[in-house]
């Protein structure tokens, strides 16, 4: 996270970290949405990874931290054909449920779509420098604004993004606050609701007039609920 500060230890009980067991590298975030399921970005998928819940500092473990491995992973259309503007979403079933504790509690799915102009909070253990490989020991949090989708489309003509999309655009137009490498898959929380999954942005991060894109959770609710209910053939919205 660029331009943020250390998150309050109590404000991210639903935030999980995806990491590789050997190198202990945190490569993505995710959101616990109930005792057994985590929502993150499809591009965060790796062959072998673990999920750390209830974590704050990488160096000083919370007593109630839990580790899980993915039992099942679900993608849109049961394929990994996501693009920059579509279907960058992955639902992970944990190998065993987690109980609520001091630093672990799921975040409910949104009850209504977000509105442009909302203040949104982003969080993660990703880079805190736009240009250097500087990663914090604790998650950083910062507030950004929900922008018109066009503001993510116009600055990136090379991506040929479609006129409408199931992504949200969020950032600060003057730059300086943004998600960055390592924050992918983490939540975008607008007016207290879990509305987005960090998907992609510019490199270097946090440049003026280069906001980032987030998968729109609200548009995928039917798919998420169907998978959790056991209908594993469900497909994402077209």
Swiss-Prot record:
UniProtKB keywords: Disulfide bond, Fibrinogenolytic toxin, Glycoprotein, Hemostasis impairing toxin, Hydrolase, Hypotensive agent, Protease, Secreted, Serine protease, Toxin
GO-annotated biological processes: proteolysis; regulation of blood pressure
GO molecular function, one term: serine-type endopeptidase activity
PROSITE patterns named in the record: TRYPSIN_DOM, TRYPSIN_HIS, TRYPSIN_SER
Classification via SUPFAM superfamilies: Trypsin-like serine proteases (SSF50494)
Source taxonomy: Eukaryota, Metazoa, Chordata, Craniata, Vertebrata
The protein, known as: Thrombin-like enzyme halystase
Activity regulation annotation text: Inhibited by diisopropylfluorophosphate (DFP), PMSF and leupeptin.
């Amino acid at each position: 996270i660029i331009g943020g500060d250390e998150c309050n230890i109590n404000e991210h009980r639903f935030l999980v970290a995806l990491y590789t067991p050997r190198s202990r590298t945190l490569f993505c975030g995710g959101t616990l949405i109930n005792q057994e399921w985590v929502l993150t970005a499809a591009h965060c998928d790796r062959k072998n990874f673990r999920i750390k819940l209830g974590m704050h500092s990488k160096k000083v473990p919370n007593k109630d931290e839990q580790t899980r491995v993915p039992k099942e992973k679900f993608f849109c259309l049961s394929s990994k054909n996501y693009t920059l503007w579509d279907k960058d979403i992955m639902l992970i079933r944990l190998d065993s449920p987690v109980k609520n504790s001091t630093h672990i509690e799921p975040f409910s799915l949104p009850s209504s779509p977000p509105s442009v102009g909302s203040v949104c909070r982003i969080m993660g253990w990703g880079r805190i420098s736009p240009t250097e490989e500087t990663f914090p020991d604790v998650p950083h949090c910062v507030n950004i604004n929900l922008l018109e989708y066009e503001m993510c489309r116009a600055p990136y003509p090379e991506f040929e993004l479609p006129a409408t999309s199931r992504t949200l655009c969020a950032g600060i137009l003057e730059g300086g606050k943004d998600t960055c490498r390592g924050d992918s898959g983490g939540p975008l929380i607008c007016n207290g609701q879990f509305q987005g999954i960090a998907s992609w942005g510019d490199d270097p991060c946090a440049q003026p007039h280069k906001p980032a894109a987030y998968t729109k959770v609200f548009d995928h609710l039917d798919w998420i609920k169907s998978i959790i209910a056991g209908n594993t053939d469900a497909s994402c919205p077209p």
